[in-house]
Amino acid sequence: EHEAALEKQQKEYEKTIQALRQQLQEQDETAASSQMEYVAIQTQAAGKTIVLDEALTRVLIDKQLQEEGWEADSEELTYQKGARPEKGHNRAIAEWPTNYQGQKGRADYVLFAGLTPIAVVEAKKENTNVAGKIRQAERYSKGFQIAAPLVPAFDLAGRTIAWPDDNDAHYNVPFVYSCNGRPYVPQLAEQCGTWFRDVRSPSNTKRALEKFHTPDGLLDLLKRSKEKAEQALKAEPFGYLKLRDYQEKAIHAVEGTLEKDSRRALLAMATGTGKTRTIIGLMYRFLKAERFKRILFLVDRNALGQQAIDAFNEAPLEQNQTLSKIYNVAEMGDMAAEAETRVQVATVQAMVKRVFMNDTPPPVDAYDCIIIDEAHRGYTLDQEMTEGELATRDASQYLSSYRRVLDYFDAVKIGLTA
């Protein structure tokens, strides 16, 4: 009886969504965007009580792609209806045909940055292991046929050929996603979230994201070579940093950890051993080698943030210049995240407000490296951590927010502790 009632409810929701879609088709172009928003809201509400099929899931995914700067409409922007990539447009085109080893298929979405196919998206219904379905997106990447006027992604990356896989085939599209429109919940990790993999290297593993990357974020990731940056770091001398031996070893240890494809590192240095000086040296090396685009230096108190700013303004580096003289360092309160900003100093509280209490939160690719000062304090949660603009009801609520800030950004995390 319960199953019959649930099936009846699901049919009613599907009927409602279908009616909304019909209304959308009948609207003129001026009303289309607001109507699509309404459809997405209704679909999201329906998804709380029923299992959404793949078609309804795409309504949610369309909206999520739009929020990150992609032109997306899986009803209208389809290959069959004549949608094609266009210079100056970041477009998600649905149902793009592929052919991998004679097996024809259709990618749910291919994301184009201008004329360059940069990512494949596999959309799945809700009760599906979305993490496991990323292999299907990988097959579509290998089966994508590049022909004029398309510009291959490997061209933009400075290569002459696509990226090889383990079986004598090549990935023609460098990034792949698998998702079902549901937000990421760690307890249900493989059943939700936006799963992502950079297929350019066999050692790159899939990972869950809060959102899709922006077009600019994917283009930066495409053009930023981890291998070249690591070579530059190995060739970069330490002399001008005037560090002690153990400080240089600490920097080498962090760089070596990241070279092994780990995305997390913890640096423990006792009080009085020059932790701040060491981390400034590490940050400068990262930026000079173009290992990272933008670093978020995260603190839990205004006082620690100001100490960091003072150190960035005073500690001499190459040619006796300071970090803030060489690179654009955004101080606390300056949260504009302009393109030229290379280092952002912020409190956890300010980032919680910016990410979770803002109508226009930053994209997940706003920072690709986060350095957490006094990282252990995020877990001890002493009374000092309530300082700042954000008032929290209890420690568990704050801890949840602290971790959510770290997990929100698609970034390498480096914790500092005594």
Q: For the regions a protein language model found, what residue spans apply to each?
A:
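ATP-dependent helicase/translocase motor core
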Residues: 1-294, 299, 303-319, 340-343, ...
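Structural recognition of the conserved hydrophobic beta-strand(s) that form the central parallel beta-sheet
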Residues: 178, 344-347, 371, 411-417
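Conserved helicase motor
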Residues: 302, 324-334, 348-353
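SF2 helicase catalytic motif II
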Residues: 362-414
